[in-house]
Amino acid sequence: MNLAVIFGGASYEHEISIVSAISLKKILPALEHFIFVDGNRDFYWIPASEMRSKHFADGIYKKNPKLFLRPGGFYAKGLWGEKRVPFDTALNLIHGGDGEDGKLASLLEFFRIPFIGPRIEASVMSFNKHLTKLYAKERGVKTLPYLLARKNEKREFGNEFPLIVKPLRLGSSIGVSIAKNRQELDYALDVAFEFDEAALLEPFMQGIKEYNLAGCKINGEYHFSIIEEPQKKEFLDFDKKYLDFSRTQKLLKADLSEASERLLKEAFIKLYDDSFEGSLIRCDFFVQNQEVFLNEINPIPGSLANYLFEDFPKILQSLAHNLPKERGIKIDYRYIHQIQKAKGK
């Protein structure tokens, strides 16, 4: 498959994206083209042979060709003119801001570059935890009750604990804390506000089952991963969730009844359908007393959750060949001519 992996970004999850891209290269050794977005949002063409963490941490990437966008692709300037990066489809692998919030999707759609990843509306909705709650409700998928806290507003949250506190627009469990009393809540909010102007508070459900399910729709048919039950102490913190995702070995399937598995897949379809076409996403669910609750939609999971799939390369290739088509618009200026004639100009 002729893909170009776009990774990095001006994001708190910048380094996670680098690790994700390096891990994906191990799974798909045929990948040749990588496009790195640094903290200044400059694009660099990175050959597969230079995909090492040191290359980015030490700033060596700045010696690579800098890229710019034109309709249809990424280009580098050379001695004999411009050279296009030779790929058919881009793969959005930027976690957090720039990749999951719709910025990169906007650029790729504007320049008519085919890509795997969430489209603009799906990105904006899934990146904001409050919008995700509203979307899930509209789709008939339950979520836990919640409160919103804003940085400069007075805080009145009652006395029901424990609570889990999350920055409103951030992933990878960065800035997430559990508060068991008012003092811990104040501290947790201060931590969350280091990363965002708003935070989402939910009841922390001790002992609730959590399951992760990844998938995509190709030619009208859903392709699901195995269902994972993450191993955790209290909650999936940054170290457990993302320093561990670079693993490449396959996981054992969660011990679930057929009925529970069906409920999870039905909820996934409700969330994916007519919103996430062209992307491979992972939905994280809670299950309690045979009730399914959405925890979060991860529109660009770490290393695209390859470790959850039996035949990840085949699924990715099929997805690349069955992307949503943009509706063409014909511009012929006939209305301008009519208006000018009516005005006598």
Swiss-Prot record:
- CC cofactor: Mg(2+); Mn(2+)
- The answer on whether this UniProt entry bears the keyword Membrane reads no
PANTHER family with a match to the protein in the record: D-ALANINE--D-ALANINE LIGASE, D-ALANINE--D-ALANINE LIGASE B
Its recorded name reads D-alanine--D-alanine ligase
The GO cellular component terms are: cytoplasm
Single Gene Ontology BP annotation = regulation of cell shape
What InterPro entries would the database entry show? ATP-grasp (IPR011761), ATP_grasp_subdomain_1 (IPR013815), D-Ala_lig_Van_CS (IPR000291), D_ala_D_ala (IPR005905), Dala_Dala_lig_C (IPR011095), Dala_Dala_lig_N (IPR011127), PreATP-grasp_dom_sf (IPR016185)
Sites where the protein binds Mg(2+) 1: D284, E296
- What is this protein's function? Cell wall formation.
Cytoplasm listed as a keyword: yes
| Residues covered by the ATP-grasp domain | 133-340
